[in-house]
Regions:
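Short linear motifs in low-complexity or flexible loops
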Residues: 5-7, 20, 24
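Low-complexity, intrinsically disordered short peptide segments enriched in small/polar/basic residues
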Residues: 7-8, 82
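Hydrophobic alpha-helical signal/anchor motif
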Residues: 10-14
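RNA-binding basic/glycine-rich loop and surface signature characteristic of RAMP-family CRISPR effectors
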Residues: 22, 26-312
Length: 312
């Protein structure tokens, strides 16, 4: 579930169904399905599926979800200007940070002098990073190079925030034993013909994640646009389609529920809207093993004035 409010300057927003750039934004919720896979590994527990130890409910971190979104955007927008990814594998962050200095013609050793000559240097650097990196524009970032240089742009708060995903019902992770015919060493090959291993699975689980989009922050800080928002929805719906692996082969986003407000700061608290969304087991189902075992509903009759519900 996401909350989005509308900003007067959402960049180049096209009209859809009578809405314009001045429209508000929505809250949204996503339903995430896991079938015989590991949705999120817990390094503190031997890489078993992450759970709340007191209740048994499954958890997936916001960091995991944002990683999937970043990977999707990088895949579909490969090489396209303005859609680079700041947090990525094998790329030191300060290398990307230095690009802003190069663009503005600033030597890293002379940042203090540049600050004296340019009062708005912080804003220029922030705008450069937001313009070029989609994930900074979306989620914000802590850019340590600028923090160390005592620039105010080192910490950017993004308009999009995600919560942990939590399973609708408690989960029962299973550890299964597997064998392989390949032997690791020649010495082992003389003693045995196979090797044993273990892996964790979750037979089935439906997870619910909630998130927020602030049009106010998008307008005032990062320039997150309507086109960026549409790409975010596309990424949430399809992020597992470009991330298949033996551990994640049947994971999918089942539905995205959006609460759209007609004012920039919103017409109702997010929690009241999220409470309108129910995911419940169907009558007679004791052990869910498919999405059809659940009924997902929204009490649209209870929507506050100025809030629209969109189901994707």
């Amino acid at each position: 579930i996401f909350r989005e409010t509308a900003a007067p300057q959402m960049v180049e927003r096209h009209q859809h169904g009578g809405h314009t750039d001045a429209d508000p934004a929505p809250e949204r919720q996503a339903g995430r399905e896991v079938d015989e896979r590991v949705p999120g590994r817990d390094p503190d527990s031997g890489n078993m599926p992450r759970i709340d130890p007191e209740t048994g409910y499954g958890l997936v971190t916001d960091v995991c979800l944002k990683r999937k979104i970043r990977n999707y955007v990088e895949t579909v927008k490969e090489g396209e200007s303005g859609y680079r990814i700041y947090i990525k594998d094998n790329v030191p962050l300060n290398r990307s940070d230095r690009e802003a200095y190069d663009y503005l013609g600033i030597e890293p050793a002379k940042v203090a002098d540049a600050k004296k000559k340019k009062e708005n240097l912080d804003i220029e650097i922030r705008d450069f990073m937001c313009k070029n990196f989609y994930d900074i524009r979306t989620f914000g970032a802590v850019m340590t190079t600028f923090v160390k240089d005592k620039l105010n742009c080192g910490q950017v708060r993004g308009p999009v925030q995600l919560s942990f995903a939590k399973s609708v019902d408690p989960i029962m992770p299973q550890e299964v034993t597997i064998t392989r015919v390949a032997i690791t060493t020649e010495a082992d090959a003389e003693k045995k013909g196979t090797e044993m291993g273990r892996k964790y699975i979750v037979p089935y689980a439906l997870y619910r994640a909630e998130g927020y989009v602030s049009a106010n922050l998008a307008r005032k800080t990062t320039g997150f646009s309507e086109e960026d928002l549409e790409l975010l929805w596309q990424a949430i719906m399809n992020m597992f389609e470009v991330d298949h692996a033996a551990a994640r082969g049947k994971m999918a986003t089942r539905e995205l529920i959006v609460f759209k407000h007609d004012s920039e700061l919103g017409n109702a608290p997010a929690y009241k809207l999220f409470d309108l969304v129910k995911a419940e087991r169907r009558e007679g189902v004791d052990t869910p093993r498919a999405y059809s075992d659940y009924n997902v509903s929204v009490d649209e009759a209870a929507l506050p004035s100025g809030v629209e519900c969109i189901r994707i």
